[in-house]
């Protein structure tokens, strides 16, 4: 009997990951059977865990916190997206045995905004809140959609300015944000502790979409604040999660899943 194609997600912690359910839905669309497991790698043991997985028949892997930068250094070659982001969330085993690193986070975000939420990015003004790895990973793809302007705001200005210089966008301290934006994206992790970014409510007055890159309860504080402050539409990051997973699946298998029914399936869980 032929073994099923094996995939995984590496993280620490990783027990909460919804990736196995998402990828099994993609496999149903393709009409194939796959194995997809969560692997909690020890801090300091990521490289060995990856080597063991691929050495025992693994075909592809997703990578989540805190290993995305380490995965970047582990990969033998990189996509342009991964090089720009400096982080890898997808590892692909090539026919020559080498590992190729890619970053599909930006694709997941942009596809959710443009295809599922039906809001164009081209010609729009975008405010990014936060300057960590999550934000850095999505800037290259957002720029490909040719927005009129991207502004990055962070509590510590130096980190925002570093990304602004790297990607040719604007930076401001979070407390100094003013003016209306079409799309406001929260890439901070404060919602996990019930906190919202220190921004004035009037920036949401002409906001077509307020988006939090996290999903579920952690997104609620920011999205509630945005809605109460005038944002026309709000969304958490579930669509981004499904979208980046679909892009990974396509890289591994050459089959592009339809993300809409999978988003609805995950909402109903």
Swiss-Prot record:
One GO term (biological process): shikimate metabolic process
EC number: 1.1.1.25
GO molecular-function term, one example from the UniProt record: NADP binding
One Gene Ontology cellular component: cytosol
Keyword set includes Magnesium: no
Region forming the signal peptide: none
Binding of NADP(+), residues: 80, 130-134, 154-159, 213, 237
Keywords: Amino-acid biosynthesis, Aromatic amino acid biosynthesis, NADP, Oxidoreductase
Binding site for shikimate: 17-19, 64, 89, 105, 215
InterPro entries: Aminoacid_DH-like_N_sf, NAD(P)-bd_dom_sf, SDH_C, Shikimate_DH, Shikimate_DH-bd_N, Shikimate_DH_fam, Shikm_DH/Glu-tRNA_Rdtase
Active-site residues, Swiss-Prot/TrEMBL: 68 (proton acceptor)
Protein family according to the UniProt entry: Belongs to the shikimate dehydrogenase family.
Job description of the protein: Involved in the biosynthesis of the chorismate, which leads to the biosynthesis of aromatic amino acids. Catalyzes the reversible NADPH linked reduction of 3-dehydroshikimate (DHSA) to yield shikimate (SA).
NCBIfam families: aroE, PRK00258.1-2
Assembly and oligomerization: Homodimer.
Name of the protein in question: Shikimate dehydrogenase (NADP(+))
